[in-house]
Amino acid sequence: MQQEAAQRESEELQHVQWRPRAVSGWGVPQLLWYLVFLQPIITEVHLRRRNVQFLFIRFSAWQYAGTDKLWAGLVTTLCEGIRRHYGALPFSVYSVLGNKPATRQDCCQSEWHCRRRVCLGLLALLAALGLGVGLLYLSLGGHALGHGSPSGSLLKVFGGAATTLSGSGLLMAVYSVGKHLFVSQRKKIERLVSREKFGSQLGFMCEVKKEVELLTDFLCFLEIYQRRRLRVVLEVTGLDTCYPERVVGVLNAINTLLSDSHAPFIFILVVDPSILAACLESAGNMKGTADNGYLFLNRTVTLPFSVPIMGRRTKLQFLHDAVQSRDDLLYREMTRKPWLPGDAGGESAQLLAVQAQAGTERGQGRIDDEAARRIQEALFCLHDERDCLYEYVPDNVVSMRRIVNTVPITVRLLQQQQQQGDFGGPTPRQAVAWVVLANQWPCRLSWALQCLEDRQQTGGAPEGRARLWDVFRDNSRELHTMTKALQNVLDLDGDPELFERFLGADFPFTVAEAQSLLRCTVNLDHSIRRRMGLIRAVSALKPPSPPKSPTRDTPHAAHRANSASRAPPSGRASGQAGEGHHTGDLAHRGKLWPVACALFRPGQSSPGGP
C-alpha cells in the first residue's frame, strides 16, 4: 500500500505545480498558523486529488480482553495512534481553536479562508491588553511623580479592568490548549469508562461519538493542509481470542466509526471467519440479528479477502525464518569456549577437584555439542527443499513456530534416551517428522498408540518391525463409530489423505520407533489417549445374552435324533454332515451380523459386500 501511494503521488506531482506540505520539523509553526487563523475549504481540486498517505495503526484485541469495554480500547488506540503520529500540540490547538472544514457552493478555487472573527477577537484582546497596560503605566507614573488626583485613580481602575479581562481571555485559551496537551482523548475515554453509572447511559456513546467526530475533522483539516488524501488503516488482530459479547462490541464500534460516509478509516480484520461467525451466533445480544453469522459478516465486510494457499518458496522462507529465530538453541553450545582452570594454589586436593570438574565440563560440552548438531540437522530437514517434510507443515506461522520450538526439546530427550542404552534409536529426521505428526494429527496418532497399548496389555502386541499405519488401519472402523464422542478432538486433525501418505509412504514409522519416540514426545496431549481408552473400554462391555428356552431346544433335539436315525451310508452321510455344518455356520453368522452392522453408517456397504 505504501508503494502504491508513493507511485500515485509521484504521478500526481508531474501534472501539478503544488507540492505537499510537511507537518513535522519546521513545518509545525506554519501548521499552527493555519490552525488558528485560517479555515479550510473543501474544493473540487481537493476532491480530485489521487495521492494518498496511509497511516497504519495496529490494535491487538487480546491486550484489552480483560475489560468489558473492548470497543473503548479500539477507539482509544485509534486516537492515541493519530495523536502520536501528528504530535500532541497541533491536535490540542485544533481541539480548542480549530474550525471544521467548510464546503463552498461557488466556483472559488481557494482552499483557505481567513477567520475574521478570530483575527478581530485576537486584535481586540491585544488592543485591550495594550490599553490597560498603558493606563496602568500612566496612573502609576503620575502617582510616582506626586500628582495624586481622582483622574489617576480612575485610570488605574480602567487599566486594571482592561488588563484583567484581556489577559484572562488569553490565559483561558492557553490553559485550554495546555489541558488538551496533557489530557489526551485516550484518558478522557478511559475516565468515562471507569464511571459505571455514566457508562450505562446513552450520553456515554454520545461523548465518544463527539471525540471521534473531532478526530475526523482534524484529519480532514490535515488533508487540505498537506494537499493529499489521508487514510487511517487500523489492523485488528487477536479478535478470535475474546469472548463473543466483546467481539460484538468491537464490530459495533467499527460500524459506529464507519457510519460517516466521509470517514477516513479502513479496518482490516485479521481473523478466521468461522470463529467470528460462531461468536456472532452465540452472543446473547445478537439474537434475531445475527442468527447466521456469515450473513451478518456479508452485511458488514465490504472487501472480503482470504489469504491464498502458501506456495512452496514462501513456506520454505517462513520455516527458515522460524528456524533462524531459534539461533540461541542452535549455536549456544557450539560457540562455548572451553574453560581453562587457573592456578590451584599448590594444594593437591584442590588441583584434583578442579581437574575433575574440568573433565566433567568437557564431557558435558561434548554432549551439548552433539545435541546442537542433531538439533541443527533436524531443523534443516524441516525447511529442506529436497525433503518432503515441509509439505506436511501447515500454512500457519503460529504452527510453524510451535513445531520449531518443540524440535529442540524432543531431540534432546531422544539423545538422553539413547545415552541410557538405546543406541539404535530414531534419527533426527524421524524426530522432527514425529513432531510434525503429533502436531498435525493428534487424534489419529493417539488412537493408533492407544490401540497399540491395548494389544500389548492383552498379550497380542504386534512385532516391533510392524508399521504403525497398519495398526491404525486395522482399527480405523472402530474409530469411525466414535466420531460423535470424539468430535472435538477429531477437529484438531488435518487432512486424512495426507495422514495416510505420511505414515504409509513418506514416513513409515514402525511400532518400535513409535514406542521409542513416544517417551520423548512433549507436544501430544496424553489426555486424548486416556479418553479414548475409557470410551473403548465402555464400548467393549456387552450385555449378557438371555438364557435359551428348553421348550425350543426339545423339538430341535428330536429332529436331530430322527435325522441321525435315517442317516444313509457313509459317503452320503458325510455330505449331509458337511451341509449341516454349513447351515450352522450361516446361523452363527446371522447372530453376528447385527454387531458388525453397528460399525457402519446407513448406506455404507459392509466389508466384502457388494
Swiss-Prot record:
<feature type="region of interest" description="Disordered">
    <location>
        <begin position="540"/>
        <end position="587"/>
    </location>
</feature>
<dbReference type="InterPro" id="IPR052754">
    <property type="entry name" value="NTPase_KAP_P-loop"/>
</dbReference>
<keyword id="KW-0472">Membrane</keyword>
<feature type="transmembrane region" description="Helical">
    <location>
        <begin position="157"/>
        <end position="177"/>
    </location>
</feature>
<feature type="transmembrane region" description="Helical">
    <location>
        <begin position="118"/>
        <end position="138"/>
    </location>
</feature>
<feature type="transmembrane region" description="Helical">
    <location>
        <begin position="22"/>
        <end position="42"/>
    </location>
</feature>
<protein>
    <recommendedName>
        <fullName>NTPase KAP family P-loop domain-containing protein 1</fullName>
    </recommendedName>
</protein>
<feature type="domain" description="KAP NTPase">
    <location>
        <begin position="1"/>
        <end position="414"/>
    </location>
</feature>
<keyword id="KW-0812">Transmembrane</keyword>
<feature type="compositionally biased region" description="Low complexity">
    <location>
        <begin position="560"/>
        <end position="575"/>
    </location>
</feature>
<dbReference type="InterPro" id="IPR011646">
    <property type="entry name" value="KAP_P-loop"/>
</dbReference>
<keyword id="KW-1133">Transmembrane helix</keyword>
<dbReference type="Pfam" id="PF07693">
    <property type="entry name" value="KAP_NTPase"/>
</dbReference>
<dbReference type="GO" id="GO:0016020">
    <property type="term" value="C:membrane"/>
</dbReference>
